[in-house]
Amino acid sequence: KLSQSGLKSEFVGYHMETASSRILCIIKDSENVDAAFKGDTVEIITEETPFYGESGGQAGDAGVMAGTGFNITVIDTKRPLNDLIIHHCRITEGSVSADDRAELIPDIDNRKAARRNHTATHILHGVLRRVLGPHVRQAGSLVAPGGFRFDFNHFEALSAEAIQKIEDEVNSIILEKIEVKTIVLQYQEAIDSGALAFFEEKY
């Protein structure tokens, strides 16, 4: 239904920690509503958002929205479509209407923790391919502020020696404190620059 609505939201969180945006849509019990009130649990879509929507195995952001006459707790954020981000919310004070403006403020400590763990999955993947061989492919992942899970394919159980070598190499890279930069590229540009892409894998 949402995919046919034409609603779009732009993620601005790579270069902004907070943002002011217009509320495009409020959904309660799977229906569009004009307004929501204290105690309501709703989904909110805004024109722009600094909230990261769950995708690629990384958990979505939590935080708050606030505006004239309302405060909202953002419990979770999802990204069901590439250009659509949905905030799962609870109205904690006042009432909010479609077209209202809101300040969107993610929990930055949680965001940074999730980013660290997301980066760690890439480090681990690179080390696994170096230690075990280039056949190793990411088969799934879960990245959250408190930790991460990384699933991969290999033809045998890992020996204690291999596990220790992998841990040592990962820790060595972390201790180098290499600066991490976010660069948004077109697909072919990313592949040409050496990025690994296993898009036939679903997880």
Language model segments and positions:
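A glycine- and charged-residue-rich anion-binding loop/surface
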Residues: 1-203
